[in-house]
């Protein structure tokens, strides 16, 4: 299940943590944009998402500043390719920024002409996996047209991180449900699948019913603060297994320090928290 990525190491001084945390922290789910378009991109995305506030400037440098201040040891950029033909430029930009502590996934669009070629390029560039967003990319994870992507990622041992559940910037019906991710994991048992937003944003009852216990990872991004019943978070973690839950923020849409505090304040054991904040990501990406 876990892949090896040689050559990753902790940067000097990054092991230092703030007083409220004695744990190493890796954020598997952040977003950055080129400096020239970061401000306009955040303004556009916020406007279409009920004026959702942002907590960084959306640039690599500002994310680094906030992350180190909050005690993070590392973080993952998750670019979304929103149009066919963009993958080459997006992935080249991401690869230029894929250096510890700031790692990066790559991206592919379901309508790209050479899907397998794009996925191979992501591997050849040394990127850490592939990010997908069924709403922004308008596809369902079980559609036959994306099957070659899953097959190739499984073959090349590239983890995939997929948006889960509803999206504040879109209207229903949504493209994929927790049961679809469960089926995807059944079809591709060797594929490392990470479902964002604890398996399905605002679909957490369905996550408990259809996805908990399956061969997938769940990330915590943009989830806990929206859950009316906080005990459901703990219940999902315990039933699914803390060894299959990864810490994420969806930065710039969540304050980095607050996100750590939200998760660390839950009634989980120290070992469970260490798995979520660091150990599980370290096993996947071998750092």
Question: Language-model segments: which ranges?
Answer:
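Active-site environment of divalent metal-dependent phosphoester hydrolases
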Residues: 33-36, 82-85, 111-114, 137, ...
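Catalytic pocket-lining loop regions of alpha/beta-barrel enzymes
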Residues: 128-129, 142-246
């Amino acid at each position: 299940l876990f892949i090896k990525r040689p050559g990753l190491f902790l940067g000097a001084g990054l092991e230092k943590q703030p007083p409220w945390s004695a744990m190493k922290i890796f954020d598997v789910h952040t977003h950055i944009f080129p400096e020239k378009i970061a401000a306009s991109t955040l303004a556009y995305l916020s406007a279409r998402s009920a004026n959702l506030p942002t907590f960084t400037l959306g640039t690599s440098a500002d994310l680094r500043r906030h992350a180190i201040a909050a005690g993070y040891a590392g973080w993952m950029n998750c670019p979304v390719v929103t149009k066919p033909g963009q993958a080459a430029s997006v992935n080249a930009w991401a690869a230029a920024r894929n250096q510890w502590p700031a790692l990066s996934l790559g991206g592919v669009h379901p309508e790209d002409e050479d899907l397998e070629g794009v996925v191979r390029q992501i591997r050849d560039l040394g990127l850490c996996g592939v990010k997908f967003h069924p709403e922004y990319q308008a596809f369902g994870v079980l559609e036959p047209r994306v099957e070659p992507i899953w097959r190739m990622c499984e073959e090349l041992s590239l983890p995939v991180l997929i948006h889960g559940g509803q999206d504040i910037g879109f209207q229903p019906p949504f493209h994929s449900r927790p049961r679809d991710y469960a089926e995807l994991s059944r079809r591709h048992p060797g594929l490392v699948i990470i479902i964002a937003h604890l398996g399905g944003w605002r679909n957490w009852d369905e996550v408990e019913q259809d996805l908990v216990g399956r061969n997938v990872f769940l990330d915590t991004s943009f989830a806990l603060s929206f859950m009316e019943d906080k005990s459901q978070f703990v219940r999902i973690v315990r039933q699914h297994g803390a060894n299959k839950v990864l810490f994420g923020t969806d930065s710039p849409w969540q304050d980095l320090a607050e996100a750590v505090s939200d998760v660390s304040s839950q009634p989980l054991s120290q070992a469970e928290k260490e798995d979520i904040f660091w150990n599980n990501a370290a096993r996947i990406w071998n750092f």
